[in-house]
Design a protein with these regions (language model features):
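Conserved beta/loop motifs at nucleotide-recognition and modification sites
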Residues: 1-348
Length: 348
């Protein structure tokens, strides 16, 4: 399920590509963020502008981290381009938060010649430590781009194009549901789109096609489970829980954290519903990216009273304490928690 970090700025990918092509390559880039599919597309465009003939052994150099050899980098930067106007130095996975001599690296980057472009390409998990002098320098003196998850409209349009390439048309609701169950990162969605396109019998991809074969994130499965609880479909809710726990990768304590987060979001949505605050308020409070998810959350919250949701949050906290401080079986504790939530407890 797509959640948004506080005060996260959305990257306008098309605008960044336009600026790159119109203004030309800069000297130093810091490319990072979770949306690695768009990061690689941007990097490819940048490479093509710098070294149109491709990754030769003269104008193009690549260095892989996490360690960084400053002498090797200096030699690559100083090397004159051969049969091209520019040279391109690609640094992959260098741990910029732990560079041994940040001052020396900063000095080196300050003197990158106009004919050279240096690109630090970070993994999707990388998060720059803004307290460090080197990171501050990079943010203030280079082209720093954080490749964020895209807006719902942009992602839906992209999904539609991917399905069209398979000869399929996807319903809007099905595209939104795919984002909901499989997440909003493009590289994760590509194999799911391929699976769903291969499975769908007709020319139109529906929600049922997505549900049949797409990978469901634990957050989406828990959302489905609480939907069942809200509709008093207790057997269906327990079936979903058993399915979730049948995956050995889903540890009970990790699933408890997901369930606790969902109950807190439902409580916030129920409060918003009582005060007629709408989906935009729920999106802000619950850090949700898409209004379709917020609307579904509000609808589900109406199946519980505020007191039931408050008690459910308390039960999650109590279960967390028991898992961490007692010898009780975590799986049984989690099942007991869900039974008590399903029973609609309102008081201790």
């Amino acid at each position: 399920m797509a959640k948004k970090k506080k005060d996260e700025k959305q990257l306008n990918y098309k605008e960044e590509i336009r600026l790159l092509k119109s203004g030309g390559p800069a000297r130093v880039y810091l490319l990072w963020g979770p949306e690695d599919y768009l990061r690689e597309l941007y990097l490819q465009t940048l490479k093509e502008l710098c070294v149109p003939e491709g990754e030769d052994g003269f104008s193009y150099k690549r260095m892989d981290g996490p360690e960084l050899n400053l002498q090797e980098l200096s030699d690559a930067i100083d090397a004159l381009p051969f049969l091209t106007e520019r040279s391109f130095v690609e640094l992959r996975g260098v741990d910029l938060n732990r560079v041994k001599d940040g001052d020396a690296l900063q000095k080196l980057l300050e003197d990158v010649p106009d004919y050279c472009t240096v690109a630090f390409v970070q993994s999707a998990a990388f998060e720059p430590d803004g307290r460090l002098k080197l990171i501050k320098f990079l943010k203030e003196n280079t082209v720093e781009l954080k490749f964020t998850e895209q807006t719902q409209d942009a992602l839906v349009n992209w999904i539609a194009k991917r399905f069209a390439a398979h000869g399929k048309r996807v319903e809007l609701e099905a595209a939104q549901h795919l984002i909901f169950v499989s997440g909003d990162l493009m590289n994760r969605l590509i194999p799911e789109i391929e699976k769903v396109a291969a499975y769908a019998k007709g020319d139109v991809v529906t929600v049922s096609d997505v549900d049949a074969v797409a990978h469901h994130l634990p957050e989406a499965v828990v959302f489905e489970m609480t939907d069942h609880l809200a509709r008093r479909e207790y057997n269906a809710a327990m079936e979903v829980l058993n399915e979730l726990l049948s995956d050995k990768n889903n540890e009970p304590i990790a699933m408890l954290a997901v369930i606790g987060g969902q109950m807190r979001r439902l409580y916030a949505a129920r409060l918003a519903a009582e005060k007629n605050l709408g989906a935009s308020y729920v999106m802000e409070v619950c850090k949700l990216r898409y209004d379709s998810i917020a609307s579904r959350l509000i609808a589900s919250s109406r199946g519980f009273s505020l007191q039931q949701l408050k008690r459910a949050i308390e039960l999650c906290a109590e279960t967390d304490y028991q898992m961490k401080s007692s010898s009780s079986d975590d799986l049984e504790l989690l099942k007991e928690l869900m039974l008590r939530i399903a029973a609609g407890e309102t008081h201790a």
